[in-house]
């Protein structure tokens, strides 16, 4: 857990000091006198406490600490980067890789405002949208982001206010009859081999190019010169670019749960 809590403390100091003032006599003459005046000074102190310090002050047990870390590391945050077209994308299929890939945008006006995980698909729906991309592509059926989002909430894979648990990816894809193979964060050649053979790879990205916290995307192919093609449910423009594999490997969320950060998907 990397976020910090800022605590504020304050105190008031009372002190006295002399000040000069002009005294006027009844006859109109004046003289400068001194008097003692009470003053007060406010002291404010700000201190950033680490999560460990906060949990210690609350009295967390070791088990509670581990559970808090688990919750933090096993949710997909919704801080995405890139463009966000809140319009009807229509029917989009990428045909520049080993297999045609159906593309859905979570910000598509047809469903971006639909409620999901205490938010909306447009804001928090990268997980269901990535599943919809992979499932529609590999099954040949029309499986939309709202359908996957409804399944996610009904089966406890949505975490309120934080998008989706990482377990959504393997569980939802298996629900649609697909085979899911978990791959670790250092499996570059395994990913290239999978993409070259027409498989898809869902990945949870960490802070960097695609997100400030966590974001699901789909790797959909590899070019002859080793560049990776993606389907980013939040950014159509990112989905049209070629990406360096080392960047993908470096920014994949290494703390991912449920066998991530990479899930190789095949029919």
Regions found by a protein language model. Give the residues of each.
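Sec/Tat-exported extracytoplasmic proteins
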Residues: 108, 130, 134-142, 152-156, ...
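Extracytoplasmic/secreted envelope proteins and their assembly/folding machinery
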Residues: 127-135, 145, 149, 166-173, ...
């Amino acid at each position: 857990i990397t976020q910090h809590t800022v605590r504020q403390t304050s105190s008031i100091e009372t002190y006295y000091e002399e000040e000069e003032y002009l005294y006027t006599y009844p006859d109109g003459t004046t003289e400068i006198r001194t008097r003692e005046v009470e003053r007060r000074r406010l002291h404010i102190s700000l201190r950033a406490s680490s999560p460990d310090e906060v949990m210690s002050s609350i009295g967390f047990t070791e088990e509670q600490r581990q559970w808090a870390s688990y919750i933090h590391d096993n949710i997909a945050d919704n801080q995405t980067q890139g463009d966000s077209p809140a319009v009807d994308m229509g029917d989009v299929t990428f045909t520049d890789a080993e297999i045609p890939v159906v593309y859905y945008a979570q910000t598509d006006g047809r469903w971006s405002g639909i409620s999901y995980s205490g938010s909306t698909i447009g804001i928090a729906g990268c997980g269901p949208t990535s599943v919809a991309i992979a499932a529609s592509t590999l099954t040949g059926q029309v499986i939309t982001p709202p359908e996957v989002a409804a399944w996610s909430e009904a089966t406890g894979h949505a975490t309120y206010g934080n998008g989706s648990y990482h377990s959504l990816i393997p569980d939802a894809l298996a629900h649609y009859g697909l085979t899911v193979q978990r791959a670790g964060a250092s499996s570059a050649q395994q990913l290239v081999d999978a993409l070259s053979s027409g498989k898809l790879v869902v990945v949870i990205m960490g802070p960097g190019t695609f997100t400030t916290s966590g974001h699901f995307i789909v790797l959909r192919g590899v070019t002859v010169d080793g560049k990776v093609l993606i389907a980013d449910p939040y950014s159509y423009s990112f989905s049209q670019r070629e990406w360096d594999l080392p960047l993908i490997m470096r920014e994949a969320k290494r703390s991912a749960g449920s066998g991530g950060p990479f899930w190789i998907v095949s029919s």
